[in-house]
Amino acid sequence: MLERGLSELGSDAGGDQRERLLRFLELLRKWNRVYSLTAIEDPCEGVRLHLLDSLSIASFLHGRRVLDVGTGPGLPGIPLAIVQPERRFVLLDCNAKKIRFVRQAVIELGLANVVPVQARIESFTDAEGFDCVLARAYASLAEIWTDAAPLLRTGGTVLALKGRRPEAELGDLPAGVAVGIHRLRVPGVEAERHLAELKPTGQDS
């Protein structure tokens, strides 16, 4: 299922990367028995809703530094970091048990390009800034932009994963924000998936 799904997404993930993706899923299932990190327990659903859903936005990432806000148990950050080792990912969450799991997963999977951080985005600072800030099931677009915009480098974008097209949220965005809405196709998932791409008005892609 994973190999077929990756093929449908156009991913060129190699054998070692596919193995790491499945190992991550197994680690998540193992820790979930004690820490209740996710409501998804079925392995097939995990492939679709954790791995493939996360990787459906891989082609939208750019630049070297990526921040995953409200990463929870490392989603979408860890799957993306596995298939894009050339980028550096900071995985941010205020939940101690979830960041504890992410730290252990990073160690066991040998992900040298991932830094887990336990903090709230409102109090998080970073001198270098980020090319992409990711948010999956995090907040409204206006809230995401308010929190994430100060952390963007010049040319940076906020990528917010949504279910249905977030029409009602678009009107709440402040002036000066350019928005692109992309329909995502996730193999094996019938529910709607959209990606909102936010950046300052007038900024070239």
Curated annotation (Swiss-Prot):
One of the record's GO cellular component terms: cytosol
Key words, A-Z: Cytoplasm, Methyltransferase, rRNA processing, S-adenosyl-L-methionine, Transferase
CDD domains reported in the protein's UniProt record: AdoMet_MTases
Location(s), subcellular: Cytoplasm
Top-rank EC class of the record's enzyme: transferase
Known EC number: 2.1.1.170
Domain of life: Bacteria
GO MF, any single term: rRNA (guanine-N7-)-methyltransferase activity
Binding site for S-adenosyl-L-methionine: G70, L75, I121, E122, R136
Function field: Specifically methylates the N7 position of guanine in position 527 of 16S rRNA.
HAMAP family associated with the record: 16SrRNA_methyltr_G (MF_00074)
Family to which the UniProt record says this protein belongs: Belongs to the methyltransferase superfamily. RNA methyltransferase RsmG family.
Protein name: Ribosomal RNA small subunit methyltransferase G
Annotated source species: Methylococcus capsulatus (strain ATCC 33009 / NCIMB 11132 / Bath)
